[in-house]
Amino acid sequence: MQPFDQPVIALRKKILELHDMAETQGLDFKEELNLLEERLRRLELDIYGNMKAWNRVQLARHPERPTTLDYVRLICDDFIELHGDRHGYDDAAIVGGIAMLNGQAVTVIGHQRGKDTKENIRRNFGMPHPEGYRKALRLMQQAVKFNRPIITFIDTKGAYPGRAAEERGQSEAIAKNLFEMAGMPVPIISIVIGEGGSGGALGIGVCDQLLMLENSTYSVISPEGAAALLWKDASLAEKAAESMQITAPDLLRLGIADGIISEVIGGAHLDVSLQADKLKSVLEQKLAQLTRLTPEQLIEKRTEKYHQIGT
């Protein structure tokens, strides 16, 4: 299946080829390039300005979409990754550690996908085992001990559903994280940067502020899974995506998300540095607001936030 924005991709490629030809052959294509770039701007507005839910799902899953580590390395200084759950395991599908954000020490945790087949296998395609959630909880408890704000990056299809993961307590690990995060006396900000899939996302997603990138999704099940359950046909995923209300605008309207971070036109993968700047700006603003609250106020407001969802 071709991407929905294939005409834009093809035109961008043509413009780059013309730029290269002008440089290598010393030819003047200024007029032609101006026309093509104007045509590209109109095409981008037409396609990206009228996206449906399934189009956003495609962008959220883009193989070049920035990951947790991409953002952490761009928005934070002195990041030190910490490993292991202290029970003999280190799940590479969840990364975390301590870093400095504008001079303030923070704990950062997030799902981590791979950029190629080899890394995806090592990171289990960003689907954590229970040990990943236990590692995340260990880092969050450490953040509480040292009074550090917690920032989590959500980007997973879901917790790994394999038999071994279930035998080692997948449900218990996620449930314990939900319980513990609800009462942590430090600011917690969660950002959905790609896919937010079911309990696998919630396992690091109980927070004071839930932010979503413009083209991210957050849902109890994938569109393919919903289509298979509802209509016994996973190929109806596009239809399911439209009815599930899983996009950032949907979730903001429903009171689940607390804010949307705008994306670079065409998706975050097209300019990772600019996207990181956008994310950092909003993150700093939200962090400044939350750090002014007392621990008691944080827990009270967090509890109220979740009580209001669905009412």
UniProtKB/Swiss-Prot annotation:
Disulfide bonds: none annotated. The lineage of its organism: Bacteria, Bacillati, Bacillota, Bacilli, Bacillales. GO terms for biological process: fatty acid biosynthetic process; malonyl-CoA biosynthetic process. Pfam families: ACCA. It catalyses: N(6)-carboxybiotinyl-L-lysyl-[protein] + acetyl-CoA = N(6)-biotinyl-L-lysyl-[protein] + malonyl-CoA. It is found in: Cytoplasm. It comes from the Bacteria. Component of the acetyl coenzyme A carboxylase (ACC) complex. First, biotin carboxylase catalyzes the carboxylation of biotin on its carrier protein (BCCP) and then the CO(2) group is transferred by the carboxyltransferase to acetyl-CoA to form malonyl-CoA. SUPFAM superfamilies: ClpP/crotonase (SSF52096). The keyword Transport does not apply. GO terms for cellular component: acetyl-CoA carboxylase complex. GO terms for molecular function: acetyl-CoA carboxylase activity; ATP binding; carboxyl- or carbamoyltransferase activity. This is Acetyl-coenzyme A carboxylase carboxyl transferase subunit alpha. It is an enzyme of class 2 (transferase). Pathway: Lipid metabolism; malonyl-CoA biosynthesis; malonyl-CoA from acetyl-CoA: step 1/1. The keyword Oxidoreductase does not apply.
